[in-house]
Amino acid sequence: MAVDNMAADTLEEVNKTNNIDEPTMKEVSIWKSSLAWQVTIYMGLQSMIFYCIVTWLPSILIQQGMTSSQAGWMLSIMQLALIPTIFFCSILAGHTSSQHSLVMVGSLCIIIGFLGLLLVHSFKSTILWIILLGIGGGFTFSLSMMFFNLRTNNANEAARLSGMAQSIGYLLAAFGPMFFGYLHDATNNWTMPLITLIGVSSVCLLSGLGASRNLSV
């Protein structure tokens, strides 16, 4: 009987402890986390950049003198460069505590790619700019997905961060192609849209540096 009473008392104390700890965990709101917002902004801007590239890259290249067939092949080359980079970056990101260097590589590839499209229009150089855009897009997309796990402590937090970042991020990204199409119509060239994309890529870099810190939401 004494052993049974001790076991019952111990079980009761454990239950009390669990009941105290559980509400404390529920009080944390992911919407109040600056780190969560940095992940969300990074997610949204990298998606916006990708959607704009897929939507308008052929038109940009055609206006620079390529045929529609050549422009289509350039878009295919970009995606061929993007796909293996996603897997490569995922492996690297999972083995480092901070992803600062990966964020910088991805964003700088995109910025250099846009600068190249803006300033140098030869066929061979354009292939280089397109490959850089693909590599950069692979890095940024992979990191935006990895941050859901890397910046959280458990599956529940990861699910909440993913829901926040993807709902707001894709909503933000959806306006990108329309906005840059409007800029083109207003200026009748792709100079201002490309300059704006360089600016967006710079903001994406800054938010990525914040999101890549070895912290949790």
Regions found by a protein language model. Give the residues of each.
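Multi-pass alpha-helical transporter architecture, strongest
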Residues: I195-V217
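Hydrophobic core of transmembrane alpha-helices in multi-pass small-molecule transporters
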Residues: S125-F139
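Structural signature of the two symmetry-related core transmembrane helices
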Residues: S101-G116
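Intracellular juxtamembrane helix-capping segments at the cytosolic ends
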Residues: F139-N153
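A late C-terminal transmembrane helix in Major Facilitator Superfamily
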Residues: T152-L197
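Juxtamembrane intracellular "pre-TM" segments in multi-pass secondary transporters
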Residues: N5-V39
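Extracytoplasmic gate region of multi-pass secondary transporters
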Residues: K32-I86
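Helix-to-loop junctions at the C-terminal end of transmembrane segments
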Residues: T85-S98
